[in-house]
Amino acid sequence: MSRVTIAIALCLVHTGCEAVSGGAVELSWKLRPASSDLPDKFVDCASGLDGTNPVTRVRLFWDVDGQQGTASWRCDDNHGVTGFDLPEGSALLSIAPECAEGPASTSTYTAPPAEKRRVISGDTVSLGAVEMILRVSYCGQQPCICE
């Protein structure tokens, strides 16, 4: 091999790769109404229904062997990927909707139970598509999402 070839190969190795020290999480989400009498079986982040306000963000929570963290994305993105921020280890991963004023009241939605996954440095854990069920009807009789 010539010196030029070796030099080019070394440049590519040093500039083309970035060291990572943790794992990442990828997920997508859909919002469903708690009441099945609505004609549409999915709702937008801003449902436009009386007594509700928009879900502005979706937050991912993690606890990896006692080390906790979060990441959030705009609800309308319908998809999110963290950086390689999670430490290696056994992770509990959960999600929750957020309103403009802060976290949504837990009485106004149902999120999937926390999932246990193994985080490996340099790898991405996929939660796949998750659904959150939101209270968006009968808001005069019960609390609704982000009211």
Can you describe what each PLM-predicted range is?
Residues D63-G80:
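Short, acidic Ser/Thr/Gly-rich low-complexity loop/linker segments typical of extracellular
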Residues M1-I6:
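Bacterial N-terminal signal peptides that target proteins for export
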Residues C17-V20:
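N-terminal Sec signal peptide cleavage junction
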Residues V58-L60:
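Short beta-strand elements bearing conserved aromatic residues within extracellular beta-rich modules
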Residues R74-D77, E98-Q142:
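Structured interaction patches on ligand/partner-binding surfaces of diverse proteins
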Residues C75-E101:
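Short Pro-Gly-centered beta-turn/loop motif in secreted/extracellular proteins
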Residues S28-G51:
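Short amphipathic, basic-aromatic surface patches that mediate peripheral association
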